[in-house]
From Swiss-Prot:
Changing C420S: Loss of geranylgeranylation and association to membranes. Loss of interaction with NS5A, PIK3R1 and PIK3R2. No effect on interaction with PTPN13. The modification Phosphothreonine is found at T404. It is a lipid-anchor. The lineage of its organism: Eukaryota, Metazoa, Chordata, Craniata, Vertebrata. It holds the Pfam family LRR_6. SUPFAM superfamilies: RNI-like. The CAAX motif is a signal for the geranylgeranylation of FBXL2 and is required for its association with cell membranes and the recruitment of substrates to the active SCF(FBXL2) complex. Deletion of the F-box domain creates a dominant-negative protein that inhibits replication of hepatitis C virus RNA when overexpressed in a hepatoma cell line; this inhibition could be overcome by NS5A coexpression. InterPro entries: F-box_dom, F-box_LRR-repeat, Leu-rich_rpt, Leu-rich_rpt_Cys-con_subtyp, LRR_dom_sf. A motif (CAAX motif) lies at residues 420-423. Calcium-activated substrate recognition component of the SCF (SKP1-cullin-F-box protein) E3 ubiquitin-protein ligase complex, SCF(FBXL2), which mediates the ubiquitination and subsequent proteasomal degradation of target proteins. Unlike many F-box proteins, FBXL2 does not seem to target phosphodegron within its substrates but rather calmodulin-binding motifs and is thereby antagonized by calmodulin. This is the case for the cyclins CCND2 and CCND3 which polyubiquitination and subsequent degradation are inhibited by calmodulin. A lipid is attached at C420 (S-geranylgeranyl cysteine). Residues 9-55 form the F-box domain. This is F-box/LRR-repeat protein 2.
C-alpha cells in the first residue's frame, strides 16, 4: 500500500502516537523498515525501541555483519528481549560485546552457526546479561569449558542451553555449568563427543528441574551415566540417546523405574536394546508420545504388543531397520487405543518381513498421516493402493525398483526412468 503525504498526515492527526506505536508493534522487520521510509514522523515511530523486542535475522543471514548487530543493539537497548542471529557467520565477539552492553534485558539469544564467536562472547553475556534464559550455541565450535564457567557465574537464570556440536566441551565444563545454573530445564549436548558418564553424574547432582536432555552421538556414554540421570532427574520428559551404542536394557530399566513422565524417547542405533527393556519401559511410562527405535535390531513384535497395551498416547513411531518386526506386530499396534486414536507417523523402512497384510491392519489407524515403506520388499503397489482407498489423506513414501527394460532397438525413442515413485 502506498500513502500520499495527505494520507499519512491524516493518520497522524486522527490516531495518537501511543496507538500508532501499538499498531507498529505487530509488524515484522521488513514492514517496519518500509514504514520508516514514509516520513520523519513514521521513521521515529517505526524505529522506536519498543517495536524491536523480538528480532529474527535468519532470513538476512548472509548480509548481517557485526555493525548491523551493533546498530540494532543501540536502537533497541533495554527493550530487546529476543534475538536470533542463527546462521549469521559474519558476526563476531566484538559486535556481541557491544550488544551485551546495550541489551541487558535480553532473555532469548540464538547464536546457532555463528562460527566466529569464541569464549569472549560468553564472558560478555555473563557480565552484562544476567536475565538470559534461553541460549543456543549450536556449532559454535570454538566454545570451550571456559565459556560454561562464565555462563554459570553470570547467567544463573538460564533454563535452556544448546551446546550441540561444541565438541571441545568436557565433564569439567558441564560441572562448572550445572553448579551455577541449577534451574536448567533443557540441555542439548548432541555431538559433544568428549562427554563421559561423569558429566551426567554432575547433571544428576544439580539439575533436578531438567525436562529435556539430548545426548545424541555422545558415544562414550554408558548405562552407568543414564542410570545416574534417571535417578536425579525424575521430571524428564524428552531424552535422546540416539547413537549411544554402548547402552543396554539397563538404561531402559532405569528410565522405566524413575521417569514416569517420559514422553519422547529417541534411541536410534542403540543396537543392544531388546524386548525385555522396552517391556519394562512401556509398563511404567504411559505418557510416551514419540519413539525413535531405528536400528534397534533386536526388538520383535513383543515390543509392539507392550506399547499397544500400555502406551495409549503414542503418536509417532520409527521402526526403520527393525527387521524382526512382522505383520502381527502391526496388527496389535493398529488395534490398540493409540492406533485407533493417536498414531500419526509410522516408519517401517527396511522392515523386510512386512507385507500387504500389515497395510490392511493399518486401515484401522484413521488418524495416520505419514507412512514410510522404503525397501519393504514384500509390500506391493496394489497393497498401497488398497490402503489409500481407505485412508486417502495418508502420505505413503515407497520405492519400487524399475523393471529391467528390453534391449533397446537402434533408433528407438528416449527411455524414461520410472523407478522413483512417491505415492
Amino acid at each position: 500500500m502506498v500513502f500520499s503525504n495527505n494520507d499519512e498526515g491524516l493518520i497522524n492527526k486522527k490516531l495518537p502516537k501511543e496507538l500508532l506505536l501499538r499498531i507498529f508493534s505487530f509488524l515484522d522487520i521488513v514492514t517496519l523498515c518500509r514504514c520508516a521510509q514514509i516520513s520523519k514522523a513514521w521513521n521515529i515511530l517505526a524505529l522506536d525501541g519498543s517495536n524491536w523486542q523480538r528480532i529474527d535475522l535468519f532470513n538476512f543471514q548472509t548480509d548481517v555483519e557485526g555493525r548491523v548487530v551493533e546498530n540494532i543493539s543501540k536502537r533497541c537497548g533495554g527493550f530487546l528481549r529476543k534475538l536470533s542471529l542463527r546462521g549469521c557467520i559474519g558476526v563476531g565477539d566484538s559486535s556481541l560485546k557491544t550488544f551485551a552492553q546495550n541489551c541487558r534485558n535480553i532473555e532469548h539469544l540464538n547464536l546457532n552457526g555463528c562460527t566466529k564467536i569464541t569464549d569472549s562472547t560468553c564472558y560478555s553475556l555473563s557480565r552484562f546479561c544476567s536475565k538470559l534464559k534461553h541460549l543456543d550455541l549450536t556449532s559454535c565450535v570454538s566454545i570451550t569449558n571456559s565459556s560454561l564457567k562464565g555462563i554459570s557465574e553470570g547467567c544463573r537464570n538460564l533454563e535452556y542451553l544448546n551446546l550441540s556440536w561444541c565438541d571441545q566441551i568436557t565433564k569439567d565444563g558441564i560441572e562448572a555449568l550445572v553448579r551455577g545454573c541449577r534451574g536448567l530445564k533443557a540441555l542439548l549436548l548432541r555431538g559433544c563427543t568428549q562427554l563421559e558418564d561423569e558429566a551426567l553424574k554432575h547433571i544428576q547432582n544439580y539439575c533436578h528441574e531438567l525436562v529435556s536432555l539430548n545426548l545424541q552421538s555422545c558415544s562414550r556414554i554408558t548405562d552407568e551415566g543414564v542410570v545416574q540421570i534417571c535417578r536425579g532427574c525424575h521430571r524428564l520428559q524428552a531424552l535422546c540417546l540416539s547413537g549411544c551404542s554402548n547402552l543396554t536394557d539397563a538404561s531402559l530399566t532405569a528410565l522405566g523405574l524413575n521417569c514416569p513422565r517420559l514422553q519422547i524417547l529417541e534411541a536410534a542405533r542403540c543396537s543392544h536394546l531388546t524386548d525385555a527393556g522396552f517391556t519394562l519401559l512401556a509398563r511404567n511410562c504411559h505418557e510416551l508420545e514419540k519413539m525413535d527405535l531405528e536400528e534397534c535390531i533386536l526388538i520383535t513384535d513383543s515390543t509392539l504388543i507392550q506399547l499397544s497395551i500400555h502406551c495409549p498416547k503414542l503418536q509417532a513411531l520409527s521402526l526403520s531397520h527393525c527387521e524382526l518386526i512382522t505383520d502381527d506386530g502391526i496388527l496389535h499396534l493398529s488395534n490398540s487405543t493409540c492406533g485407533h486414536e493417536r498414531l500419526r507417523v509410522l516408519e517401517l523402512d527396511n522392515c523386510l518381513l512386512i507385507t500387504d497384510v500389515a497395510l490392511e491392519h493399518l486401515e484401522n489407524c484413521r488418524g495416520l498421516e505419514r507412512l514410510e515403506l522404503y525397501d519393504c520388499q514384500q509390500v506391493t503397489r496394489a497393497g498401497i493402493k488398497r490402503m489409500r482407498a481407505q485412508l486417502p489423506h495418508v502420505k505413503v513414501h515407497a520405492y519400487f525398483a524399475p523393471v529391467t527394460p528390453p534391449t533397446a532397438v537402434a533408433g528407438s525413442g528416449q527411455r524414461l526412468c520410472r523407478c522413483c515413485v512417491i505415492l
